[in-house]
């Protein structure tokens, strides 16, 4: 795996499809994708000449995500992580999105052909195991405009808009309203309690990765259950210099949402490769009226907000964050018999 991420050459069985060990490495990286409350709402099928991605409706958060928008976004992030991992290992992905109209859960089929990895592929793949969702306060250092421009250019390749939020006071008010609305929603709170503040679980948000929400922060955080992560010393949330970025699409159908997830992946990995801390923000987009307010504030009639992202520089005294858990590949990947024999 180290050689692959360092770009020292593709590991392949032949010129048509990667061998079993390469596929395993690819999917190990793919499932490191962030997802709403770390539900990991995906499953994979390995076929003789392709990889198939499916959503898991049983992992949909019915109160937090009633129409399944964030489920599709999460799977889009995993899809792009897979594409990046393949490229770093010497395989160009050919993605067919929603290939089966009769199966709404079948989100993508990924074919491959040989590819010589470039440095960008290698850098993005190397960022996958290093990326963390860092909900803590960031330092006061600003994010360079050129860095944001690169993220926007990469998102645009997939037809997704990235805009920096300039009116932070108004955005803070929108987010605070979403937090307030959720506090009075008993079903939402029950769901949040189930999926956060966890210890020793293979899914959900661990307590060790949750700081307490601070209302003085430029953008208030979600009120997770049982937060167990301390803020860095001598860091005031009010001085947080993070940039707030919004990803939006021209339409709001399932394809647009999947593409937005893919764009979120490339922005998060680009930020990580630059040494930036990052954190998706989805709470204000989970309620119709606050999502409409974000749309009016950032995109107007020209786009639908799909995800907000907080990007900035972690304080120099911030402790490294542990990785969040993932299910074993055996729980989320279906292997064909011939590749199972290769693994034995």
UniProtKB/Swiss-Prot annotation:
Keywords: Flavoprotein, FMN, NAD, NADP, Oxidoreductase, Virulence
Ranges that cross the membrane: none
Induction pattern: A member of the dormancy regulon. Induced in response to reduced oxygen tension (hypoxia), low levels of nitric oxide (NO) and carbon monoxide (CO). It is hoped that this regulon will give insight into the latent, or dormant phase of infection.
MF terms in GO: oxidoreductase activity
InterPro entries named in the record: Nitroreductase-like, Nitroreductase/BluB
A GO cellular component annotation in the UniProt record: plasma membrane
Essential cofactor(s): FMN
Applied uses, from the record: This protein serves as an immunogenic antigen, inducing gamma-interferon responses in whole-blood cultures from M.tuberculosis-exposed adults in Uganda, and The Gambia but not from South Africa, indicating this might be a good vaccine candidate.
List of residues binding FMN: 40-44, 326
Superkingdom, taxonomy of origin: Bacteria
Similarity section: Belongs to the nitroreductase family.
Function: Stimulates pro-inflammatory cytokine expression via TLR2 signaling pathway. Activation of TLR2 results in the phosphorylation and activation of NF-kappa-B. Also induces TLR2 expression. May influence the innate immune responses to facilitate the survival of M.tuberculosis in the granulomatous microenvironment.
Further information: Was identified as a high-confidence drug target.
Oligomer status and interactors: Interacts with human TLR2.
The protein's name in its UniProt record: Putative NAD(P)H nitroreductase Rv3131
